[in-house]
């Protein structure tokens, strides 16, 4: 792909494909717990284990699937990922009376996502100059976020007809798999980093962006996971759904607008803006009414637009590995942060809920938004200043 043209026909097709993949996935994801409970006849603790393993497959395997994509080729990897998505959708469709097929469908879609994400994001920036990367990364994120915003709406319209929903989603996945067969295979560039053995899939890790990404998602996912529960009885379901759609649409509109400015911004400054907005949003939630929740979600959307983009750009700039491997490593960081959010955040939420002081939960999360980033920066600087034992010997 030409280095000087950011939005070629191939890249536009990729962006459209990502939009549709996310519409399909997020028309299913919000309703998975209900679906699994109905088909498996299990309690929510068991359902939580199944969903947790699915999340682990999707995120913890990302460095391995990224290393595989580096060897297999990005176009082939995208086709393979979409075939896995299609098989997962088919398993959901035919597994109404077979819980094992339903669980297999979950794992196939999780595995497909693990392979698709680094391949898609790497293909978008393949052959692009460093000056074009911010626009392409932000456009890729925007397409995904638009799909995330629209997917639950599609799911809500079709959830009463699950067979139809799974048939539509499977048809979308299969059509995309066929379309990606005609995608141009990427050519290896002269300045491409060497392909390293699988055992070195984590070598060349950009440590600071990895750590900041993990912390970002640790605090961010507490908003994403627990606000719906907090909002029950405080605001209407329609208002909450519209507000969360506004969050995703805010990312879609804002991130491409600020991409070049974020790229030029110093990392600590971007962290201050991003985590600062997250803290403001968490504090706003303590108001517990429609205005407070809307303001909080808007602040978090603005902060996320800056912080999440800067994390990826810094990882690309600081690592000597290929973009495919870097995006896989970053996806692992997302999984680490999200898992910590589920464990730590869930216990904290339960503690405050049991004590009848639920707004205090958001103050604790806001305090972490303020305290954790400078702690991460401080530890990173100390590590850089620490003498190397090999040098002193």
Question: Which residues does each predicted region cover?
Answer:
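Juxtamembrane intracellular "pre-TM" segments in multi-pass secondary transporters
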Residues: 1-8, 184-212
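Helix-loop boundary and gating motifs at the non-cytosolic
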Residues: 5-55, 206-212, 216-243
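Structural signature of the two symmetry-related core transmembrane helices
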Residues: 76-90, 269-283
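Cytoplasmic helix-loop-helix junction between adjacent transmembrane helices
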Residues: 106-144
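A membrane-interface helix-boundary motif in multi-pass transporters
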Residues: 159-171, 349-369
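C-terminal membrane-cytosol helix-exit motif in multi-pass small-molecule transporters
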Residues: 171-189, 375-379
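A late C-terminal transmembrane helix in Major Facilitator Superfamily
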Residues: 324-354
């Amino acid at each position: 792909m030409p280095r000087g043209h950011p939005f070629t026909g191939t890249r536009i097709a990729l962006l459209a494909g990502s939009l549709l993949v996310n519409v399909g996935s997020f028309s299913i994801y919000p309703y998975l717990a209900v679906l699994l409970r109905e088909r498996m006849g299990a309690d929510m603790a068991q359902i939580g284990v199944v969903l947790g393993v699915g999340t682990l497959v999707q995120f913890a395997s990302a460095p391995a699937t990224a290393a595989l994509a580096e060897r297999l080729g990005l176009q082939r990897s995208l086709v393979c990922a979409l075939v896995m998505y299609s098989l997962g959708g088919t398993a959901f469709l035919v597994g109404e009376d077979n819980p094992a097929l339903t669980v297999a469908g979950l794992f196939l879609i999780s595995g497909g996502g693990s392979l698709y994400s680094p391949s898609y994001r790497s293909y978008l920036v393949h052959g692009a100059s460093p000056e074009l990367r911010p626009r392409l990364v932000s456009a890729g994120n925007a397409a995904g976020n638009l799909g995330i915003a629209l997917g639950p709406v599609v799911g809500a319209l079709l959830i009463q007809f699950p067979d139809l929903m799974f048939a539509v989603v499977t048809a979308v996945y299969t059509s995309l798999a066929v379309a990606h067969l005609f995608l141009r295979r990427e050519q290896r560039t002269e300045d491409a980093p060497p392909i390293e053995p699988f055992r070195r899939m984590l070598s060349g890790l950009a440590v600071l962006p990895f750590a900041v990404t993990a912390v970002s998602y640790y605090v961010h996912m507490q908003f994403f996971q627990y606000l719906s529960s907090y909002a029950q009885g405080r605001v209407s379901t329609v208002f909450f759904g519209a507000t969360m759609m506004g969050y995703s649409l805010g990312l879609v509109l804002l991130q491409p607008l600020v991409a070049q400015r974020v790229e030029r911004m110093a990392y600590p400054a971007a962290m201050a803006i991003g985590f600062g907005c997250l803290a403001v949003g968490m504090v706003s939630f303590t108001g517990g009414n429609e205005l407070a929740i809307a303001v909080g979600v808007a602040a978090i959307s603005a902060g996320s637009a800056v912080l999440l983009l800067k994390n990826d750009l810094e990882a690309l700039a600081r690592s000597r590995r290929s973009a495919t491997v870097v995006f896989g490593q970053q996806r692992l960081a997302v999984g680490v942060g999200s898992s910590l959010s589920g464990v730590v955040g869930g216990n904290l939420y339960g503690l405050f809920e049991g004590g009848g002081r639920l707004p205090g939960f958001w103050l604790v999360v806001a305090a972490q938004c303020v305290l954790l980033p400078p702690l991460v920066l401080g530890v990173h600087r100390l590590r850089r200043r620490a003498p190397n034992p090999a040098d002193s010997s």
